[in-house]
Amino acid sequence: CRNVRIDNVTIHHSEGMAFIFQLCHNVSLTGCRIEPSENRLISSCADATHFVNCSGDILMKDCVMESQCDDATNVHGIYTRVQKIEGNRLYLQFMHNQQEGVPLYHAGDRLCLIKCGDMTAFGECRVVSAERVNGQLCCVSVDRLPEGIAEQDGVENIDRAPENVTITGCVTGKNRARSFLISCRGHVRITGNELHSNGAAIWISGDCRYWYESGPVEDVEVSGNQIECKNSGIVGWGTAAVEVVPELEQSPTYYHGRIVIDGNVFRKSRGPLVHARYVRELEVKNNRLICADAQAAEILTRCCTLHNRNNTIETET
């Protein structure tokens, strides 16, 4: 699908996700509401919105996502794994059953290859042709084999990723888990939102182990938001307001690029403000933190460069 626009649509209940977009180019949601009707407690039984290997521009503006049983949104791609190499043909496997059968590869697409252990990128190639073998497996012919390629390496289609993701003026809350999950290349702007989250408000990951959700972020700005995090201690929901936690073994380099957290108001009761690792550059500035104890101001990081300045802390009793 191309140029998908959904305006002022309300979904009161969904047995699964309320909105899911896959392999779409240019998607906008404006003024949409995912919220239960008067006699219901739950809106969607999974994520409110979900974007898989979409490209072009993704816009979410003035939307309300409340009372869903999982995250407000998740924007990501898919890692497949090399199961067999025959000449210039790669047999690629979808590793999670919820991804099986996705027509992910097309002639001309650029592929990035990674070592799944430390998720280090080591080469690129282009798709010449692609065909489906079965629900789990596809055969992709490429223009060349990157040096060092081996079975069990990970493959990401970097042409099936958004150039711009903009989330602005949205409200999330009353839900399980987290608010915004972002694992994609391109420019990401999360601005002027009101987020109420039981786990992390912003979750940036990437993994080649279980969900196989790609990929590294390159340019993320989180600014001018009102963020309230309970960080209730549920495993997998995050202990920080902003979690940047790629699932990898010890890596010799960074996985994510530049992340800026600027001019937000955070309200937290426990856990650190930011937990980030394997990030090239992290900037935390001009934020106001209202918290119950000093631990909530901590920034736990294993980043190449950290800029932490002009943040204020107010302690509540």
Go through each PLM region and give its residues.
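Extracellular parallel beta-helix/beta-solenoid repeat domains
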Residues: C1-T317
